[in-house]
Amino acid sequence: MGVDIRHNKDRKVRRKEPKSQDIYLRLLVKLYRFLARRTNSTFNQVVLKRLFMSRTNRPPLSLSRMIRKMKLPGRENKTAVVVGTITDDVRVQEVPKLKVCALRVSSRARSRILKAGGKILTFDQLALDSPKGCGTVLLSGPRKGREVYRHFGKAPGTPHSHTKPYVRSKGRKFERARGRRASRGYKN
């Protein structure tokens, strides 16, 4: 009697196309599919993979982080490429001259980059500008920056856990006594 093979782990779960029905995103996917196939550069393959990603995996990149990353040695006169949104950061006083390519740039970030004499490209312009991704720096926002990640990890209330508990309210009466202070039972 033969043993049936388990087929439940056969399927590789990864996106082969974006979930979104946005026609402009679909056109970019078409373009970068072609480039990823016809050029031998990993840059195009990475951009294509990131175009498929969900919004939570394409976190916004702040202007301050981008400036910090572009100031690193050897990154002068390079194009910052972000498969996502670039947002403004009011904490930054002066913006240097930057050449940027992104899916979206928030209105205030856009005006500040252009005011500094910078240049903002779209991905189809980038494909003409550097089809192999030469002279570019691929950047992305902090994926773990979302508030929800503070609730993940060791259970709140266990020793050395810094996990945020899901609490109805942050008042005096809510998860503040037992386990939080030595005078009330114990402190973790």
From Swiss-Prot:
Matches recorded under PROSITE patterns: RIBOSOMAL_L18E
Keyword tags: Cytoplasm, Endoplasmic reticulum, Isopeptide bond, Phosphoprotein, Ribonucleoprotein, Ribosomal protein, Ubl conjugation
Chain residue numbers at which the record places covalent cross-link Glycyl lysine isopeptide (Lys-Gly) (interchain with G-Cter in SUMO2): K119, K164
Sequence segments annotated as region (Disordered): 151-188
Residues that bear Phosphoserine: S130
Subcellular location(s) per record: Cytoplasm, Cytosol; Cytoplasm; Rough endoplasmic reticulum
Predominant location category: cytoplasm
GO biological process: cytoplasmic translation
This protein's name: Large ribosomal subunit protein eL18
Organism: Canis lupus familiaris (Dog)
